Structures are given as C-alpha cells and as structure tokens.
Curated annotation (Swiss-Prot):
Protein name per its UniProtKB record: Protein real-time
Domain of life: Eukaryota
Compartment annotation: Mitochondrion
Disulfide bonds: none
Segments forming domain CRAL-TRIO: 284-460
Length: 669
C-alpha cells in the first residue's frame, strides 16, 4: 500500500535569495540534521546565463532504526539521489529525492519546493510531499511504514528550524540581504513574455500581528489559500475581512475546503436576509427596551467587549409571545452584529488583535419555567443560526450564580453547542466575585456589575414578566392546548401542532433547519391522561442511579389537580389497573415505607408545570396526580443520568435541594 504524506505550506519571512543562501549551508552535512552523514555533488550544470542551476547529489543517510533491525537488513546507512532545480529568475527551487538503496523493494519519492510568496515578495514559501511504497522488505513492511512516517515527521519539523538557524548565522556574519539575480547586460532578451503578476493580496507581518494575532506559518498560508478561493466566487459582492476568514477557518479546524463551503453558505444567507443592513434598519421593539435583561458593559481584561445577559430574570415565554420567533431571532442577530462592530472598534482603539467578545450570563432566578418547550426550541434554533454564521465570535462565556436547575438546562442545550465553544464556558456559584479564580481574573474589579456585588452600575433592564397586553394576537397563547399527544393504550393520536408551526418564521424560511439528529421535536413525547373524579394517576420510577435527576413537565387541560412526589423504600408490584392506587396497599404508611419528597402542589386549569428532583437514593419514586372533580393532563417526564452532573457540573451539586422548582415555575403559567 502506498503511503502519502503532505506537509502544510510553511512561510519564511525572509526573501527567497536569503533563504537560498541559508539552504546552501546545509551541505554537505550539518549537525542540525545528524541523519545526513554526507552529500557528494555528482552533477551540476548552469543554464540561461546563470539564471538556472541543476544539481544532483548522492546523499548518505544513517538508518534510524533499532539495532536488531539494522543487523537483519545488513546495513547501517542508505543512499538517496537528490535533484535540485534552481531558477533564480523566477525565484523557485524544486527538489526531488528518490532512494537508491533497496530500490527494488522500497520506492521513496519526495518533492519539495521553495518559492517566492505570491502575495509578499519579501517572504518565501515551502511545501513538501512524499510517497512511500513498500513492496517487499523481508517481512518488515509494517515496521518500515511506521519508521517512514516517523522519519518524515521529524525531518519536516526540523527543516524550518535549520533554515532559521543558518539565517541567524548569516545575520551574525553581517549578511542580511542578498541581491536578486539580474541577467548580464550583454545577455539576449528572453523571447518568453513577462508573466503578468495577478496577485494583489498583500499580507505583511505587521498586519497579521496588529489584526490577527500570532498565527503559525501553516495558518497564514491557509488564510491566504481561502482568501484566493473567495476571489473565484463570481457573485460575491465583497470579499470578507481577514478576521472573518480567520474565524471560519478556525471553526472548521483549519480545513480550507470545509471553511470555504461554510463561509459561502453564510455569505449567501447574509445576502438573502440583508444582514449587512441590519444595524442601520433594526429598531428595538418596546418590549425589548422595557423587558429584555441584556446589554453591553465595558470590556474584559483582554479588550473583548462584554455583553451581560441576566437570563434568570428573562420572561422567555413572554418575550417569545410578544416578539414571535422571527423577532427573537432578529434581536439575537442584532446583538451579534453589534458584537462584530464593537470588536473592530476595540481592536482599533487598543491597536492589538481583538477577534471576539465575552458573554456574562447571570442565572439568578433560573427555574424550570425557563425550560418552556417552545422557548427551548427557539433557543436551539437561534444557537444553530448563530454558530453557522458567526463562528468564533464568542471568546469566553462566564456563567455566574448558577442554581440547582442549571445542570438540567445545560444538559439540554449543551448538546447543540459546538464542542470548541463549550470549552469556553466557565461556571461560578453565588460567590463569583471573591472566590479564587473568580470574575476578577477576567474582569477588572472596578467594572464588576453591582448586581454581583461590584461597584459598577449597569444600564441593563431588570427584566421581569412581560404584560400579556404586549402579546401578539396570534401568539402561542392562543395555542397552549395544541400539543402533540399520545393517548395511553390507544396508539398515537396527533393533535394540531400550531404552536410548533408558529416557530418557523416566514421571513427566515430559507435558513436551514436543525439537523435531523438535533431536532427537539416534541411529537409523541407527551401522554394524555384522563383523571376521573376522586381517582389518581401514578407513575413509579425505580431508581438505580443515585443522584440522577427526575424532571417533569405537564399541562393541566381541564379542572384543577394535586401533584405530589413520594419516595418509596419497599418493593411495589407492577400495577395494571389505573383505578387501583398504591396507597390502597396494606401496611403502606407514610414515614415508614414511603416519604413525601415534594410538597403537594395545587395545579390550576390551563397551567403548565415544570419541575425537577435529584433522586439521591437507590429507591423507587412515585409521581402522584389526584383530582377531586376529575381533570385531564398532558404529561412528559424524563430521568437524566447522574453522569450529566460530573466534570464542570460538580461544583453545582452542593446547591441542590430536595425542593422542587415547580412552585417558582407556576409564576409563568
């Protein structure tokens, strides 16, 4: 099997002529490359008045292999033939090397190129490819492949170091400039027409240091490669900035083709939705001005603009019903556009690279009411849209005052956030200002917000409930009962899903929806339960995972009912008849073999109730609904594994209590 190797393009920030002067010092051998024992020039020819020089060398290389392997093959060194084709007029050097030893058993071919940087004549590029084809090598084919890969990696890494070493050596000797080759005065002019220079992208070191930060040579080259690919897009109105190109490359782990596809999709999206005009055309609706708890607040220690979002004070349901999905998305996109603008302003003001902004999320007041189903779906849709079109604009996310319900919210939402973005989240408990490695590590103490105990007042609204008078006439309020239902024992009966349909804004219809494996489609999740007067509905959950979390969400569709959560210590039988209650069992006594874990909650008609409970014990848990006058509810529950609360969630476990958050969620019903 042929093994192929491709190095990234490396950039020397020195002229081609100086790099060639340094390259010559590698021969016949140098201590920086001990594997090369010697090189003999066996042929050299000069062409076109010295403009071109072709050199063939026979190089003796040490076998970098275990002693026993060298004894088996019977050699301590091997020979390679190297052919150099130097063209000083066009400022290129092509190198081809093939193995002379064992050529009938192994074929090794390496091609390297040095050439003047196409966009900066004072720089030199280098790239390298190689193939390894082992036909038959005494039964050691696999070992040879591994050694070949290792050797290629080592020589690739050392190559640039050696050139840099000899350039520094030349500088110490006073050689910092080598004149370009010019033809002799009496030389006949070449009939070859002068090549038209069409490279107009100038990217110098000062620009990179000032605007993009420290990039590796490979990253610089890929940046230019993607920039050139964009030049070939016919219907592109304007080429994005280098900062934007850099963000998309970083988001796709520096895979140029993937970044190109992602960026082209985003540019088309921006064109379709007039995103370049959003900052000029957008006017904040009154409900945002009066009830949205978010805004910009100074800069962090790295110069990033800070956006504060007091999520725990946000009425998610009220904002969504007032703005609609399109309005909420436009608000989020406007914040992103403002962020880009403030990033550029900060970079210009500080005269240093600033490529993203920071988000400070205050979760005080967060409860299960924030996990309202349409609100979660809207949030996931916004996350997907932002990640597709504003990658790598978020530098750091500081999550403060995280309550006990936060791990549940994080479990749901984090799966939809890019892994690299998730790594930027930092979580803090209540004492986020004074704890070790607290906010002061990232934000100057004088600008810590007053609601966190700092001295700086913010201009951010407190949030609070949105008055229903601001709800849209066709908001989700009119469709609270339109949910997808599965009737127990009767198969799936699908009700109208107008609440779901209303989340697809017409103006943003061309946007790609959530991928199939990431959709939070609530179809078939909820069961419809009819409670006859004086009867109860019970669900028994046998817990074998201590510290797992039981979550529930139900809508009261007709009349009032009572809800209680119990913990049961005795083994209970399976129940086949809904008319029979576990509480009818003999010797089933509260405080002896069952315990009330959550106080009884009276749930009113048309209320939506969400709650959670950490199941600390390896017992059974009994969810109990009772209605004196008969009722109907649409019910969903889920058990979240304890593994969801390890790692970054560990510090939050101490904030858990046995009380349900359902009481606080009732406020938003």
């Amino acid at each position: 099997m042929v093994q192929k190797f491709q190095s990234p393009v490396r950039v020397y920030k020195y002229p081609f002529e100086l790099v060639m002067k340094a390259y010559e010092r590698r021969f016949p051998k140098c201590p920086q490359m001990p594997i090369v024992l010697d090189c003999d020039v066996i042929k050299i020819e000069s062409l076109e008045n010295g403009a071109k020089t072709n050199t063939t060398r026979r190089c003796k290389l040490a076998v970098d292999a275990p002693y026993i392997f060298k004894k088996l093959i019977g050699v301590d060194f091997v020979y390679f033939l190297q052919h150099n084709y130097l063209d000083m007029s066009n400022r290129t050097l092509s190198i081809e090397a093939v193995n002379e030893s064992f050529s009938s058993r192994i074929e090794i071919f390496e091609r390297c190129r040095y050439y003047a940087h196409p966009d900066n004549a004072e720089w030199t590029c280098f790239d390298q490819t190689a193939t390894l084809d082992i036909k038959n090598f005494f039964g050691f084919e696999h070992s040879m492949e591994k050694m070949g890969m290792k050797q290629y990696t080592q020589t690739t890494l050392k190559g640039k170091e050696i050139i840099e070493y000899f350039i520094n050596q030349l500088e110490q000797e006073g050689v910092t400039h080598v004149d370009r080759w010019v033809p002799p005065l009496d030389a006949a002019k070449s009939p070859t027409p002068e090549q038209k220079q069409h490279h107009d992208i100038l990217l110098d070191g000062d620009f990179i240091a000032r605007n993009l930060g420290q990039l590796s040579p490979m990253q610089e080259s890929k940046l230019l490669e993607l920039r050139k690919m964009l030049d070939g897009v016919d219907d592109l109105e304007r080429v994005p900035s280098y900062q934007t190109i850099l963000r998309f490359l970083s988001a796709r782990d520096w895979h140029v083709s993937q970044a190109f596809a992602m960026l082209c999709d985003s540019l088309q999206w921006r064109k379709e939705h007039r995103m370049d005009s959003l900052l000029e055309e957008y006017t904040e609706p009154a409900v945002v001005v009066e009830h949205f708890p978010g805004g910009w607040h100074h800069h962090d220690k790295d110069g990033r603009p800070i956006y504060i979002l007091r999520l725990g004070h946000m009425d998610v349901k009220g904002l969504l019903k007032s703005l609609g999905m399109e309005g909420l998305l436009r608000l989020a996109l406007h914040i992103c556009e403002e962020g880009i603008q403030k990033i550029n302003e900060s970079a210009e003001r500080l005269d240093k690279p600033v490529l993203n902004w920071s988000l400070l999320v205050d979760l005080e007041g967060l409860s299960m009411r924030h996990l309202w189903r349409p609100g979660i779906k809207a949030l996931l849709y916004i996350i997907e849209t932002v990640e597709r079109n504003y990658p790598e604009t978020m530098g750091r996310v500081l999550v403060v005052r995280a309550p006990r319900v936060f791990p549940i919210a994080w479990t749901i939402v984090s799966a939809f956030i890019d892994e690299h973005t998730r790594s930027k989240f930092l979580f803090y408990g209540p004492d986020c200002e004074h704890m070790k490695d607290g906010l002061a590590q990232y934000i100057d103490e004088e600008i810590v917000p007053d609601f966190l105990g700092g001295p700086c007042k913010t201009m951010i609204h407190e949030g609070g409930l949105v008055p229903k008078t601001l709800y849209k006439a066709n908001s989700l309020e009119d469709h609270d009962d339109d949910v997808t239902i599965v009737s127990p024992g009767a198969g799936a009966a699908t009700a109208t899903a107008s609440a779901e349909a209303s989340l697809a804004p017409v103006a943003l219809a061309p946007m790609k929806r959530l991928s199939a494996n990431h959709q939070h489609d609530h179809q078939n999740l909820y069961k419809s339960v009819d409670l006859k007067p004086g009867f109860s509905h019970e669900l028994l959950i046998r817990n074998e995972d201590p510290k797992s979390v039981l979550t529930w969400d139900f809508d009261v569709m007709r009349n009032d009912l009572h809800f209680t959560l119990y913990r049961v210590t005795q083994e209970l039988p399976e129940k086949n008849d809904d008319a029979v209650s576990y509480f009818d069992l003999q010797d089933f006594v509260e405080g002896t073999n069952y315990f009330r874990e959550e106080p009884t909650l009276i749930c009113r008609h048309k209320e939506s109730v969400q709650g959670s409970h950490v199941m600390h014990h390896n017992d059974s848990y009994l969810m109990h609904w009772f209605s004196p006058s008969g009722a109907q509810l649409n019910l969903f529950y889920e058990v979240l594994s304890s593994v969801n609360y390890k790692g970054s969630m560990t510090s939050l476990q101490s904030a858990f209590s046995s009380n349900s958050s359902a009481a606080s969620s009732v406020q938003s019903r």
